[in-house]
Every structure is written in C-alpha cells, then in structure tokens.
C-alpha cells in the first residue's frame, strides 16, 4: 500500500498532491466553461437555422451572445475560487481532537511494585495506539483524495462528452454533416469509457480500505 501511494509523500522531486488536485479541479472547470460556450453557440445556430441559413450568416448578435455567456461563466468560476479557498482554510484551522489515552493511563498507580517495568509495559500500548491513529489518518486522507480525483475525472468526462454533443449539434446546424457525425462518435466513445473510470477508482478505494478492515 505504501508503494502504491508513494506519490503522496512529500519530497523535492515529487509534485504535491494538493497541486495535482487543484490542476484537476481547474481543468474540470475549464471543460464545463467550454461546454457552456459551445452549447450556447449550438443553441444560437439552431435558432438561426429556423430562420434560414442566409440570416444566420448576417446575424451580428451570435458572436456577442456567445462572448457574453463565456464572460459570465468565467466570472462565476473565478468568484467561486476564493470561497473554496476560504472553506479550505477554515477546515485546516480547526484543531484536531485526539484522544488523551496517554494521560489517562499515566494517572494510574505506577509507584507501587516496579515503576520502570510498569511504565514500559503501559507505554507500549500507547505507542501502538498512536501508530494506529496515524495510519488511520493517512488512510482517510488517501480515501478522500481518491474520492475527489474520481469525482473530478468522471465529471470532466461527462463535460467532454457534452462538448462533443454540442459541437456536433452546431456542425449539423451549419451544414457540416461529416464532422458532426465524427463528433457524435467521439461523444459515444467518451460515454462508453465512463464506467471504466468508475471501476478504476473503485479498485483503488478497495486497495486502500482492505488493509484497514483486515
């Protein structure tokens, strides 16, 4: 398990897992931003198709509507980033509550008999409990990271498939049937690969949880 998740350890030659998570979340946001723009372009093309191809070529509102939607979506995403960072800082600022098992055991009678032997005998379970708590905390962090990355990757795949569908709709509306069917095929391939993404991350979760349950 340590070798499987050795990339989570800090080091000079290893990228921080937090940086990787932020890159994945940013890429996911960019995918959905692109989907917003392409879907608006497809909707405008369909409306122009209802009026006729000649009006679509001379309609000056198409570009401005598309740019306005992209700018508004970008502002929403940029405004959400400080909120997420503030929530993360508040979560990190909360003091970690750890059980005070060592102090409770230390209050027992150690003075009678052999104090040194009893102190060593009672410190062994305390050290074992501390090691177990550290391992459980590390395992919980790994599980949370797998959940986050799996959700982000699956959401990005859904966004890519929707981009392909919106692009295919736009291409078919403007009369490019060949590229449109290619885009539909790409959307089908991405959709077919979504269960594989879920299976891969569920497999990683089982690898992390299995040693703790045994």
Swiss-Prot record:
Annotated organism of origin: Mycobacterium tuberculosis (strain CDC 1551 / Oshkosh)
Keyword Ion transport: no
Pfam family, any one: DUF2561
Protein name per its UniProtKB record: Uncharacterized protein MT2253
Membrane topology per record: Multi-pass membrane protein
Gene Ontology cellular-component terms listed: plasma membrane
Principal location: membrane
Chain intervals for the UniProt region annotation (Disordered): 96-115
